[in-house]
Amino acid sequence: MIIPTADLFEALVGQDINVSIAGGTESWRVVSVKRREQHSLRTDQPFNVYLSAPASNDRRQGTRSSTLPNGESLEFFGVPVSATKDAISYELVFN
């Protein structure tokens, strides 16, 4: 499993990742990455990632398994933060 970094997600902006759901997978788009101020408790920089899921998404927060475009696996905890008629926006926080 790959270690999530801001650099990793910044390279994925505009690309889709496949996220496992009950009964299959969904394509979620990596929309943006926000680097936050580094603090003394970490050696790396905290960051947030914003993903766009299909409007038909289950809209639940929780741990998700995904596959990146390069085939690597990644687990993350996603929280839905907004919805439109076209998509559900999720936030991932890496403190």
List each language-model region with its residue ranges.
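Contiguous interface-forming segments/domains that mediate binding rather than catalysis
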Residues: I3-P4, L12-Q15, R36-H39, A55-R60, ...
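Short, compact, well-ordered microdomains
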Residues: Q61-N95
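Acidic, aromatic-enriched beta-alpha/helix-loop junctions
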Residues: H39-N70
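Surface-exposed, interaction-prone regions used to assemble/regulate multi-protein complexes
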Residues: W28-V31, E37-T43
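Short linear regulatory motifs enriched in tryptophan with gly/pro/ser
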Residues: P4-A6, G23, S27-R29, N48, ...
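Short, conserved beta-turn/loop elements at beta-strand boundaries and strand-helix junctions
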Residues: K34-H39, S82-D86
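N-terminal trafficking/processing presequences and adjacent post-cleavage segments
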Residues: M1-V33
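A structural detector for beta-sheet-dominated domains
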Residues: S20-A22, V31, S52, P69, ...
